[in-house]
Swiss-Prot record:
The entry's keywords: Glycoprotein, Hydrolase, Lipid degradation, Lipid metabolism, Secreted, Signal
Organism from which the protein derives: Arabidopsis thaliana (Mouse-ear cress)
Glycosylation site list: 136, 236, 259
Catalytic site: 50, 332, 335
Family per similarity comment: Belongs to the 'GDSL' lipolytic enzyme family.
Descriptive protein name: GDSL esterase/lipase At5g03610
């Protein structure tokens, strides 16, 4: 078990590091989806990692600013870890607002653009510090709190109609292995991550945010590096079993918090089962593109030492992109395509309506 965990997360570390730093710009989300229910969110505040980051890392330090990232939307690299829109954009679209501006770009946005909230997520970061030297979630929330304290942009009464997305996609666990900590300590560390997530959720709520959505950990055993050995046909169930402890503890935390508030303030976005549902159905939904090989990534390096977006010293590209990103669930070794995220949020739509809008 010790060697299995180390193999899994060493690969995960390699992928995170190479994709993030060998690899940000707000999106205008659709202003559709007008729900005639009691709670109508008008702002979205985002915290977390590359599944939610829409442009906070400086261009010189992130491959998300390199071609071919962004080829589907907006047609050029724009700081997202995908070919197009990511989780933040689809949640914003669901609640009927424009995608919130990244914190890094706030000084370049007009007041009207800031009214939809702000994105504090940084790719590669975790609940605790990771190998990525960028603000962890505690610091991201500190930044949010400072903005509220100054009162220049947002005022407390405005937060009563706000939603927060809190993305925890596993970077803490890859960092755990990078530090060569013994696998016997791994279960206790998972509890530390979830306990700190609880602290973070409480802080965000105490600052006045009305509803807080936290995704479950996605099935890490279904990431392309770990399905490669089966020609992208099967997920590694042993690795996915390691994810269940995190998700079970997270469910307990959210249930406790909701019991304390006597409301459905905290919501779990079940990414784990949403991903598996898309894989099982191959993305088959009315009006959507079918994923013939949902576990196979669209953009890959030409050999092991290269990744999506890699170029050599002469600027010659060292990656291959599939003919149509809309037919792929995964964009690179870690991140879904825009179409992948669209399919995930299609699966989540019913539960989101019940827990986020109607509740």
């Amino acid at each position: 078990m010790d060697s299995l965990i180390k193999l899994f997360f060493c690969l995960f570390i390699f992928l995170c590091t190479s994709l993030l730093f060998g690899e940000i710009n707000g999106v205008e989300g659709s202003n559709q989806n007008h729900h005639l229910y009691p709670f109508r969110p008008t702002k979205l505040f985002v915290f977390g990692d590359s599944y939610a980051d829409t442009g906070n890392i400086k261009k010189a330090f992130s491959s998300s600013w390199k071609f071919p990232y962004g080829i589907t939307f907006p047609g050029k690299p724009a700081g997202r870890f995908s070919d197009g829109r990511v989780a933040t954009d689809f949640l914003a679209k669901f609640v009927g607002i424009k995608s919130p501006i990244p914190y890094f770009w706030k000084d370049y946005a007009g007041k009207k653009r800031l009214q939809y909230g702000m994105n504090f997520a940084y790719g590669g970061t975790g609940v605790f510090n990771t190998q990525t030297p960028l603000p962890n979630m505690t610091t991201q929330i500190d930044i949010f709190q400072n903005i509220l304290t100054t009162g220049d942009i947002y005022y407390p009464p405005e937060l009563t109609s706000s939603v927060a997305l809190v993305s925890v996609a596993g970077n803490d666990y890859s960092n755990f292995i990078a530090l060569n900590r013994p696998a016997s300590e791994f279960p206790a560390f998972i509890k530390q991550v979830v306990d700190q997530t609880e602290v973070n959720l409480r802080r965000i709520h105490a600052l006045g945010v009305k509803k807080i959505a936290v995704p479950s950990l996605q099935p890490l055993g279904c990431l392309p590096p770990f399905t490669f050995v089966t020609s992208f046909q099967r997920c590694n169930e042993t690795q996915n079993a390691l994810v269940n402890l995190h998700n079970n503890l997270l469910q307990q935390v959210v249930a406790k918090l909701n019991n304390e508030t006597k409301q459905s303030t905290f919501i779990i976005l079940d990414l784990y089962n949403a991903f598996l549902t898309v894989f099982k159905n191959k993305g088959s939904n009315p009006g959507s593109t079918r994923f013939e090989s949902p576990l196979k990534p669209c953009c890959v390096g030409v050999s092991r030492e290269y990744n999506c977006g890699s170029v050599d010293e002469k600027g010659v590209k060292k990656y291959i992109v599939c003919d149509n990103p809309k037919t792929a669930f995964f964009w690179d070794g870690l991140h879904p395509t825009e179409e992948g995220w669209r399919s995930v949020y299609s699966v989540l739509r019913e539960s989101l309506t019940a827990s986020l809008i109607k509740a």
